[in-house]
Amino acid sequence: MEDAYFMDEALALAREAAADGEVPVGCAIVRGDTIVGRGRNRRETDKSALAHAEIEAIGEACRRLGGWRLWECTLYVTLEPCPMCAGAIINARIPRVVYGASDRKCGAVDSVCSLFSMEFNHHPQVESGVREAECGALLTEFFRNLRMELRSRPRWKPGSNT
């Protein structure tokens, strides 16, 4: 199957995250033609800085496959992984990462830095820009709506009791 097919699954998970008020990031981990791990951003829901889509998907794939080494898998994620998630990908020995939109603020694969090219014991192959327009549009729409919502809320002023 093609990368776009599995990125569509990650996009569906990102849409679920957005529907729950989470930053819309989704992730699918595939071995062969089978999805073995799914994850979506749950930081607000779980009140945890660790609840990223990639971390959730890696955990599910490890449990399902019975080990922490995901040597035969490809990780599909809608947004370029952050440093924490890139580290988890290295630790899980995932050989291939496919992402949609770049992350100019926190991307640790190509944008801000490249953890995968540093002197670690594992260097995943990276494919970027798969369904980039759709992934980027989902994020742009989410943050546009969030800014509009925040502007409509009354602002607290020092000295006021409300």
Give the role of each language-model region.
Residues 43-45:
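A short acidic/small-residue loop/turn micro-motif
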Residues 27, 66-67, 116-118:
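Short secondary-structure boundary/capping segments
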Residues 25-33:
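Short beta-strand scaffold segments in enzyme catalytic cores
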Residues 50, 55, 59-92, 96:
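Helix-adjacent hinge/juxtasegments
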